Every structure is written in C-alpha cells, then in structure tokens.
A protein has these predicted regions:
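AMP-dependent adenylate-forming
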Residues: 9-33, 138
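Conserved AMP-binding/adenylate-forming core of the ANL superfamily
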Residues: 22-66, 70, 74, 91-96, ...
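Short acidic/polar active-site loop segments enriched in Thr and Asp
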Residues: 54, 105, 126
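Conserved AMP-binding
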Residues: 63-66, 87, 96, 170, ...
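Structured binding elements
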Residues: 80
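Short beta->alpha connector loops at strand-helix junctions that form conserved
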Residues: 86-88, 132
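Conserved ATP-dependent adenylate/AMP-binding module captured primarily in the ANL superfamily
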Residues: 88-120, 165
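ANL superfamily adenylate-forming
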Residues: 115-173
Length: 178
C-alpha cells in the first residue's frame, strides 16, 4: 500500500525527473519535460489565484487527450480544485448540461469543441481556455483573465525572481503560490 499522499507522489516525480520527458502528444516530436510541465502548472496556479479560485471549485475539461489536457488536469488537482472530465464525444447540449450541473467555473476545451458550444448557455463559467495553447477563448463580463494572461510571464518573474526551479514545486493545496 502506498503510504504517501497522491499529490506528494507527483511533487516528488517532478523534482526527481526535472529534465526528463513527461508528456508527448501522439504523433508529434515535441515533448514537455517534467520541469516544463511544472512551470505550466505554476502559471495556471497563478491564474487560479488571480481569479480567487478556492479549494473545491470545479474546473471542466473536454477535448482529445493531449499534453495540455494533462497539464490542465494536474494544475487543477494540485491546486485543490475538482476536475470535471467530460467525454469529447458528447453532443453540445449534453456538454452544456454537464458543465452547468457540475457548477464548473472554468472550462478547458479544444478549439473545435468550443466552436459548437454556446457561451450564453454556460451560465456558471467565468472563463474558457483553449487546450491548444491555454489562451482565453471567453471570459464573463467583469473578469480580467485575458489581461492577466497577457502579463503571465511578468507575474512568473515577480513570483519566482530566480526563475521557476525544482525547489519551487510544492503541491500542498493552494501553496504553490508565494
């Protein structure tokens, strides 16, 4: 039986395998190292903090499994939020229902799926992000997600002045933010 916390296992894996390949999209030569994945997770954690996400908030993800799908998943669970994975084969009406019924506040989706969804039917969603590059596809009125993302590299520099390093990987709920 594993005596460690599930999240701590990931934390240790990121540190111990920093320069090794972690995720690769099928059929593509580019890979993310564990260190690059950890840095992407840190960026999403900064975004979550900026948007005042709390432990237990729900984040939906729908799209073909790829590296960014995994990064969104990992960022969500290591932040303490709840992931709501949705099968990409569901029709738009079912997706609207699942997202609303789950009370998700963020949605990560493929661009092709987003083209078939109606933002006005996603009543509780504060922002929608592309699984292609994490750009903001939609934000609710009054949200500042797009503005924040334009300056994410500066926020990373401000938060991690020595650069994001192995030592900065700390996945105890809501604690990766300094």
């Amino acid at each position: 039986m594993i005596k460690e916390n599930f999240i701590k296992l990931y934390e240790n894996s990121f540190r111990e395998n920093w320069d090794l390949p972690c995720y690769t999209n099928y059929g593509e030569p580019e890979s993310y190292t564990y260190g690059e994945v950890a840095e992407e997770i840190a960026k999403l954690h900064l975004l979550f903090k900026h948007c005042s996400l709390r432990r237990g908030d729900k984040i939906a993800v729908i799209g073909k499994n790829n590296a960014r799908w995994c990064i969104a998943y990992m960022a969500t669970i290591t932040y303490g939020a709840i992931i709501v994975p949705i099968l990409q084969d569901f029709n738009p009406n079912d997706v609207h229902h699942i997202v609303n019924h789950s009370e998700s506040v963020f949605l990560f989706t493929s661009d092709t799926i987003w083209e078939n969804l109606e933002e006005e039917r996603l009543t509780g969603i504060r922002a929608v992000f592309s699984l292609t590059d994490f750009r903001c596809l939609h934000q609710r009125d009054g949200e500042t997600v797009q503005k924040f993302l334009k300056h994410i590299d500066q926020y990373m520099t401000d938060t991690y002045p020595k650069g994001f390093r192995k030592e900065d990987v700390l996945y105890t709920t809501l604690s990766t933010i300094r």
